[in-house]
Every structure is written in C-alpha cells, then in structure tokens.
Amino acid sequence: MKNDNQTLKRTMTSRHIMMMALGGAIGAGLFKGSSSAIDVAGPSVIIAYLLGGIILLFIMQGLAEMAVRNRNARTFRDLVQQVLGNYAAYFLDWIYWKMWVLNIAAEAVVAAIFIQYWLPGCPIWVLALGISLIVTIVNLLSVKIFAETEYWLAMIKITVIIIFIILGLLLLFVSFGDHTASGFSNLTDHGGFFPHGGTGLITAMLVVIYSYGGTEIIGVTLAETKNPEKVVPKAVRSTLTRIVAFYLLPFFIIVSLIPWNQVNSVPESPFVMVFKMVGIPGADHIMNAVILLAIISSMNSGLYGSSRILYTQASDGRLPKVFSKLSSKNVPMFAILMCTSSLYIGVLISLFAGSQTFNYLMGSLGYTVLFIWLIIGFAHLKSRKQQTETPAYYVKWFPYTTWFAIVALLAILIGVIMTTSIVITGITAAIYLLITVAYLVKGRKHQ
C-alpha cells in the first residue's frame, strides 16, 4: 500500500477517452431498457432519443468548455464547486456516486439475465455474483489495464452495432430466401406513430435519459487523462455521431422491423430478435454475447467512476482517509471495494426480485441523470459570467444551447414526475433529502 501523499497518475490517453465517450452510454439502457422505451412510446421512441441526444450534446459541450478552462480539475465536481458552490458540488458528487453504484448493481442483474439465454436453469443471483467478481478484479489491477479493457470492450460494442445497422437495413430493403423486405409499415400500423400520444413519449424520456447517462463519465477522468484540455473537447465532438449511429438508427430499424407492441412480449432484447430474423445460424447467440460484453463494459466504467468520487471526497477530507489510499498499482483500492458493495446488494435483491430488479432500479437512475445534467447546465451558464478571456474551446451558440437543454430537462422532469410510479419518485426524493441533510449536518464542516 502506498502512502497517503500519492496521487492518481495521468495514464489514460486520447484513444482511451475517445472510446470511453463513444462506448460509455452503450449498456443496459440501450440493450435492455430499449424494450421498455418502445413499449411506452411505440415508434415515437425515435423522437424521444433524438430529443434526448440533442440535450446530451448541449450539456456535454458545456462540460468540455469548463474542463478546458480548468486543467487542474480532478472531476467535474471541482468544475461545479467553483461556480455553484459547496452544496451543489456535494450534492452532485453523491447523486453521481449513487447513480453509478445503483447502475452497476442493475447491470449485474441484466448481464445475468443475458447469460441465462444459455443457462436457463442457473439462478440469476449466482450469475450476477460471478460477473461482479470479474469486474472488481479488473478495476483493482491498474488504471492502464482498466483503460485497455474498456477500450477493447467498447470497440466490440461499436463494431457489432455497425453490423446490426447493416443487417437491419438489408432486412428493411432487400428480400432474400423466405424473407420479404419489411419496409416501414410498422411505423404507422398498430396504433400509429404515437400509439400512446404525448404521454407515452414523455414516459419514455426517463428511459432515454437513463440510456444516455454515462457519457458524462469523461468528466470524472480529468485527473487521470493526459492533456484533458485537448482530449475532452475532442471526445465531446463525437457525441452527435454517437447519437445517430448508436441510438437513432438502431431504434429506427427495430421499430420498422418489429411491431412495437411485440417487442416487450418476449424476454429477449430487441437486438437479439433482429439478429434472429437474419436467419444466420448462431447470429442470435453472437448478439447475445456482444450485449453481455457491452453491459460488463458499462459496469466496468461505472465502478471506475464511482470509486474516483469516493477517492476525491476522501482526499479533500470529507470521507475517511482510507478511501484516498492507493495500492501499489496506483488505484484507490478501498474506494473500489466500497463501491463494489453495491454489486453484491444488487445480487441480494435479485435473489428475491429476480429479473424485475433492473426495472426497480432504472426509474431512480433516470431521475439522477436528469439532475446531474441540470447541475452541469447551470454551472456552465454561471461559469461564463466568471470568464475573463475566450478559452481554446467554447460553445459557439451559448447561451441558447445551454438554456434549451435546461428548459427541456425541467419540462421532462415535470412530465416524468406526473407519469412515473409514486414509489420510484418517493424513494428518489428520500435519497436526495438524505444527501441534503448529511451536508447540513456534516458536510459544512469540511468546506
């Protein structure tokens, strides 16, 4: 164990950060949550993901601008604290930590569900436990090993989604064998493009925002990234490409090929359903394996992000110093182990709730991403007032883009509160209240 004076090293390169930005949001929200989004919105889910993607782009641009102006920032907590104060930074830190620890717990269960495709008789909790142990070990080895693992897992995800798009377009436009080109009739049949009206679209936004959550993890890598002032803006510029390639096109293909009201009637991911339609032997197994890797990749990133939040809090004296201690591999070992506890809580919940565990956790996570993006948006607005010179990277259409994102997020938040289960809303509100009380009782002492 190294002494307390050791700090995190800048070992992640541009290619690591670029791939984390590209693949960071490709996880359970896309592959498993997609069924829920389509079920409530129908074909209009395409509009929901387009709107969510535009909001994401504007928020990420603001994050990149703030990162460029403050090269010494370790995470986006430091960026927010400078402009919005101690409480906002404290609140952001803990809801972001809560988001990731619940997310990795949810994704451990989802990964187990996909493994059950091959091992239907094996209990979910056993499979979730095995996956949790693997992800823990990868994060404990070293930052370089984590970054390389994440790089190749993200590469696999991206490659397969590209293959999915190509095969999906062939199914839409080309007839072969027993398959007849599907066309676009499913977009308007079965109740129309908006089968549940505007309510369905608004309800789907919670899943959409959750699906996009994770992209902002590049704001947690600042202390371990070489030249973050150059790398982060470069990663953000790829956001629009990611939105179109990894969300809009796949969802357009899914709701065009499969009647929207049949997507949630089977336990399989709609991505696996499309691969089955191709008729290639074993195609569904290949897609299932790739989805499994994608979810493990997202868990990997989540454990990284949540452990760095604990490390930063401990380094600043807000948590016990043990969480700031680094191992011989220069990773915050105790912070990682603390965060893995959520994985095993997820395993315990799955022992009783089974496959429904993911749905229970996803609603609260959607709320959290909304609040995280709102805080980043408000921080960007205020940071411009403190700016004395134009940074190397800046948002050209400021403040219109940032205000659009904030107003849209507030509208979505109101709509989601009105359409989401009161249980999920109540639990989330209770967690936020607990964080606020903790700050008032204890957090102020360390400011």
From Swiss-Prot:
Task: Give the matching InterPro entries.
Answer: AA-permease/SLC12A_dom
A Gene Ontology cellular component where this protein is annotated is:
membrane
**Coiled coil (UniProt feature):** none
The molecular function terms of the Gene Ontology recorded here are:
amino acid transmembrane transporter activity
Keywords, sorted A to Z: Amino-acid transport, Cell membrane, Membrane, Transmembrane, Transmembrane helix, Transport
For biological process, the GO terms are: amino acid transmembrane transport
Q: Is Transmembrane there in the keyword field?
A: yes
Induction / repression: Induced in response to leucine limitation. Regulated via the T box transcriptional antitermination system.
Residues crossing the lipid bilayer are: 17-37, 40-60, 95-115, 118-138, 154-174, 200-220, 243-263, 289-311, 333-353, 361-381, 393-415, 419-441
Q: What happens when the gene is disrupted?
A: No growth phenotype is observed for the knockout strain.
**Keyword Membrane among record annotations:** yes
Q: How does it sit in the membrane?
A: Multi-pass membrane protein
Subcellular location(s): the record lists: Cell membrane
Family annotation (Pfam families): AA_permease
Which protein family is it in? Belongs to the amino acid-polyamine-organocation (APC) superfamily.
Q: Which PANTHER family match?
A: GABA PERMEASE, GAMMA-AMINOBUTYRIC ACID PERMEASE
What is known about what this protein does?
A: May participate in leucine metabolism. May transport leucine or a compound related to leucine metabolism.
Q: What is this protein called?
A: Uncharacterized amino acid permease YvbW
Q: Which organism is it from?
A: Bacillus subtilis (strain 168)
Question: Gene name, please?
Answer: yvbW
